[in-house]
Amino acid sequence: MSIKRFVSALLTGALCLGVLTACGSTQKPASSGVSADAQRYSTIFYDAFDTVTQVIAYCDSEEEFTRQMDALHADLLEYHRFYDIYNDYDGVVNVKTINDNAGVAPVQVDDKILGMLELARQMYNTTNGKLNIAMGSVLRIWHDYREAAEANTNEADNKLPEQEALDAAARHCDISNLVIDENAKTVYLSDPDMSLDVGSVGKGYAVEMVAQAAEARGLKSALISVGGNLRAIGTKPDGSQWSGGVENPWNASDVYTASSSYVSGVNMSDMALVTSGNYQRYYVVDGVRYHHLIDPDTLWPARYFDSVSVLSPDSGAADCLTTGLFCMSLEDGQKLIESLDGVEALWCTPDGEVIQSSGWADHEKK
């Protein structure tokens, strides 16, 4: 993530968790179980998943909040290390380890990796291949060109990948070559030129697991934002719901400000809100923006939408779905969402239209 987008993520999270939570729903769902005397606390972390994490929670004391946040932070950093595809860590077997051993040997991994990979494989089928973590060879090419563009001082020097190189890399994206042995707890890439890229699932899955662990430790009322991926735990002490917002993709800037706007605000209790957009990670060639959401069919940035948001009880599934939906037609996406219980979506099209799934309005702030 560039410095500009890092600042954007920080301010986006602050606005999502500050402005929107200040005016939560006055509905009275089932009691959150948190004490009516609980106080509101907040904290920010900067060292997980290359983005900004902000948490707001209601706790009975600052000591309780600190205990909860220390544990949540430690959990998040553990997932960060497990899902890293670029770096090694002492004593840690992670996704990079799996990639390094492609075609060599199965790698025994932690359950936190197995669970994430199983979800990704399931969502590959759900999205008819539009969510494919086996596309690492193709995504690495785009990543390298984007990184080179960020290093350029002259935009005119930015370049695009050659189609021939993309086609060659695409021959090593068959997810059937991802071999998972649940009994032995091993993962093996049978194609030596294949690599995993879990950017479309890792953060969302981690947020879900971290939230569930926090709940198991007794946290009853919180809103977690990791780079804008929102996950609500329970309700506020007064019974009102948390709130989240979908950023206006046409008003998004490198530095997010109070003048930026939302196309929708939703009420959230034990729900996740995740957005994927073409304004988040990109570079420009000849005046055209080339973002990071690559269509598996074309091997180029998907052009169906400017952003897609998913509201779901599960943050991991929501993360996968935003990527999958971004890379498929509106008609196919609507059919998919209507087939999933408790899941809603919002699409922002290149011509400025905002389209909601049939149940989105039930969650929308009035």
Language-model-detected regions and their locations in the chain:
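Mature catalytic core of soluble alpha/beta enzymes
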Residues: 2-366
